[in-house]
Amino acid sequence: MQNRNTFSWVKEEMTRFISVSIMIYVITRTSISNAYPIFAQQGYENPREATGRIVCANCHLANKPVDIEVPQAVLPDTVFEAVVRIPYDMQLKQVLANGKKGALNVGAVLILPEGFELAPPDRISPELKEKMGNLSFQSYRPNKRNILVVGPVPGQKYSEIVFPILSPDPATKKDVHFLKYPIYVGGNRGRGQIYPDGSKSNNTVYNATAAGIVSRIVRKEKGGYEISIADASDGRQVVDIIPPGPELLVSEGESIKLDQPLTSNPNVGGFGQGDAEIVLQDPLRVQGLLFFLASVILAQIFLVLKKKQFEKVQLSEMNF
């Protein structure tokens, strides 16, 4: 009897463990599949196309500004900060996947020159850590450590993202040289309008797939609409499905054209990209410049002293 109770207890615990594991997997998978910039990482080997366009613009159709600030020059093996600003109106609310309104999230991709990478934690100063907040950065690919991504994160807290960057040392990396390099950045606020498979999200406008008369509009129980359009030429019925989120612009009995908007455009976000330049400076060149400036200053000082000495000699000769 005791063995039977023990077996029942073990069976119950195993069932509970498996159920919890499945729930965690489903929740995690769902959150990852809907997260920027996972889509870009899964679908593109390189986030920047040959034309210079960053692939995030394929899903985030609205064009919005983004700004990047980096030092003009850095020394080898030095940690510096790259500040990405993603401005937007903090009062705006976006349409969430369930059709409700919520705060905007932001994300960014930073494309550094080859050799530049995310600074290791032990090289980051306390001041820089405070500026970074609780952000978690990751490489776009294991073999592309110069391309960093972050997000989605709350836009109200992280509309300014600080990346800690470690510059390379040409003494240890022979493919790196003391040159001027470009840095590219892409930043989005809000959800995208198109998924990587080409399907629309509920954060975009929906157009009529046929011309005719709106014969019926059915409001679905979980939100959204089914719009039946009767083609005037052959009487064919076309049903357009509208997900929860966009506001309906048409009514029953209304005559509509092909591709006419059936809904408003709920998107309040967008994507932007920019660039900057940074110089990997040779320390010897800096030392040479300092030596040159010091020699110029000393020469000026000696010239002034010599001039004053000459004036004193002239004055004494005149007095004599």
From Swiss-Prot:
Cofactor binding note of this UniProt entry: Binds 1 heme group covalently.
Binding site for heme: 36, 56, 59-60
Localization terms from the record: Plastid, Chloroplast thylakoid membrane
Signal peptide: 1-35
Protein name: Cytochrome f
Pfam families attached to this UniProt entry: Apocytochr_F_C, Apocytochr_F_N
Summary of the function given for this chain in its UniProt record: Component of the cytochrome b6-f complex, which mediates electron transfer between photosystem II (PSII) and photosystem I (PSI), cyclic electron flow around PSI, and state transitions.
SUPFAM superfamilies: Cytochrome f subunit of the cytochrome b6f complex, transmembrane anchor, Cytochrome f, large domain, Rudiment single hybrid motif
Subunit architecture: The 4 large subunits of the cytochrome b6-f complex are cytochrome b6, subunit IV (17 kDa polypeptide, petD), cytochrome f and the Rieske protein, while the 4 small subunits are PetG, PetL, PetM and PetN. The complex functions as a dimer.
Thylakoid found in the keyword field: yes
GO MF term list: electron transfer activity; heme binding; iron ion binding
Transmembrane segments: 286-306
Cofactor: heme
Single biological process term from Gene Ontology: photosynthesis
Assigned protein family: Belongs to the cytochrome f family.
Gene3D superfamilies: 2.40.50.100, Cytochrome f large domain (2.60.40.830), Single helix bin (1.20.5.700)
Keyword field contains Zinc: no
Topology versus the membrane: Single-pass membrane protein
GO cellular component annotations of the record: chloroplast thylakoid membrane
Record's keyword terms, sorted: Chloroplast, Electron transport, Heme, Iron, Membrane, Metal-binding, Photosynthesis, Plastid, Signal, Thylakoid, Transmembrane, Transmembrane helix, Transport
